C-alpha cells in the first residue's frame, strides 16, 4: 500500500491545473480537506475515497492502493 505522501502526489497529478475548489465542490468536501489529502497529512475516509475516484473516473484501488502509478 502506498504511503500518504504518495497518495497525495497522485491526487495532485490527477487534479492537474483544475482549481482545488472545483474538485472539492464536485466531491462534496472542503477545500482544506482536499488540501490535507493532497499534502499527505490525512487519508480520506472510504466514503470520500469513492467520491474522489468517481470524480476522476478511476477505481479506489487504482488511486489509493496500487503501488505503481501511471497517469
What are these regions (language model features)?
Residues 31, 41-42, 60:
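The DNA-contacting recognition helix of HTH DNA-binding domains
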Residues 1-17:
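A short, Lys/Arg-rich alpha-helix, primarily the initiator
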Residues 28, 47-62:
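DNA major-groove recognition helix of helix-turn-helix/homeodomain DNA-binding modules
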Residues 17-36:
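Short alpha-helical DNA-recognition segment
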Residues 62-71:
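Short amphipathic recognition helices of helix-turn-helix/homeodomain-type DNA-binding modules
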Residues 28, 39-41, 68:
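Residue-level detection of the helix-turn-helix DNA-binding "recognition helix"
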Residues 12, 21, 50:
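Active-site phosphate/pyrophosphate- and oxyanion-stabilizing loops and adjacent acidic/basic residues
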Residues 10, 33-36, 62:
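Residue-level recognition of specific faces of alpha-helices
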Amino acid at each position: 500500500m502506498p504511503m500518504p505522501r504518495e497518495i497525495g502526489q497522485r491526487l495532485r497529478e490527477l487534479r492537474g491545473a483544475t482549481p482545488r475548489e472545483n474538485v472539492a465542490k464536485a466531491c462534496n468536501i472542503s477545500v482544506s480537506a482536499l488540501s490535507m489529502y493532497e499534502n499527505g497529512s490525512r487519508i480520506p475516509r472510504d466514503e470520500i475515497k469513492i467520491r474522489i475516484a468517481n470524480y476522476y473516473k478511476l477505481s479506489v484501488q487504482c488511486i489509493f492502493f496500487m503501488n505503481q502509478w501511471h497517469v
